[in-house]
């Protein structure tokens, strides 16, 4: 790598600042998403109850899904900034970790707008003249669509820990981040990997939330760290 490639430029600093802000904002938006689910949507007893109540929560669901998708887009931007910050000292783990991080967000984003499918199903369910048999079939269709969304969530959560582990290795070798931050990132990746093992064995396990909260913590902490790199003169 040429010496000039290692020198920070004004554009590099902008990449880090905006990328760091993207990571922080994405984490905040996902926290807001959970608040919306808890306060405005709630938990339903089963698929049939969820379909029946959907018109009452459709606006909240749509807003929630939009925030979730935006958070994932912002996290993808943060991964790009992390690669820029780590590539000079640890090019291989920085590249592979960032690519896998982006891949996991893409897979998660693919299932971020379930209302595109569930809203029409709900419309048919609540249509005047819908028979009990038709409604039972629509509940099954609802379950099938949710299963696809759940499978995308699980795949995204399976890929993400590998990316975190590699980025943690890169951070350990990068003075701008430090061994402490790198080891914490590796620890988060290891914890998520353990959660993934449980999730693969028991797909309906609530431990999936552990993976999501680990991602939120990662992007909040590393987002701030990335944002501060140019101000501290630690751009590599």
Show where each model-derived region lies.
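Hydrophobic, aromatic-enriched alpha-helical segments typical of multi-pass transmembrane helices
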Residues: 2-236
């Amino acid at each position: 790598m040429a010496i000039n490639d290692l020198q920070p430029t004004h554009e590099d600093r902008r990449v880090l600042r905006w990328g760091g802000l993207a990571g922080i904002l994405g984490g905040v938006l996902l926290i807001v998403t959970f608040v919306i689910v808890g306060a405005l949507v709630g938990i339903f007893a089963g698929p049939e109850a969820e379909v029946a109540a959907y018109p009452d929560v459709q606006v909240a669901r749509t807003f929630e899904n939009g925030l979730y998708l935006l958070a994932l887009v912002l996290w993808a931007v943060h991964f790009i900034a992390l690669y820029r910050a780590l590539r000079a000292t640890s090019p291989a783990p920085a590249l592979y970790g960032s690519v896998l991080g982006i891949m996991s967000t893409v897979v998660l984003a693919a299932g971020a707008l379930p209302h595109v499918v569930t809203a029409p199903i709900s419309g048919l369910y609540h249509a005047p003249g819908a028979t009990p048999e038709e409604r039972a079939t629509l509940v099954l269709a609802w379950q099938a669509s949710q299963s696809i969304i759940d499978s995308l969530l699980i795949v995204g959560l399976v890929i993400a820990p590998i990316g975190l582990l590699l980025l943690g290795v890169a951070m350990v070798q990068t003075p701008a981040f430090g061994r402490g931050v790198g080891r914490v990132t590796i620890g988060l990746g290891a914890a998520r990997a353990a959660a993934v093992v449980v999730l693969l064995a028991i797909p309906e396990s609530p431990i999936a939330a552990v993976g999501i909260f680990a991602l939120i913590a990662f992007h909040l902490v590393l987002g701030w760290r990335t944002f501060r790199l140019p101000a501290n003169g630690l751009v590599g």
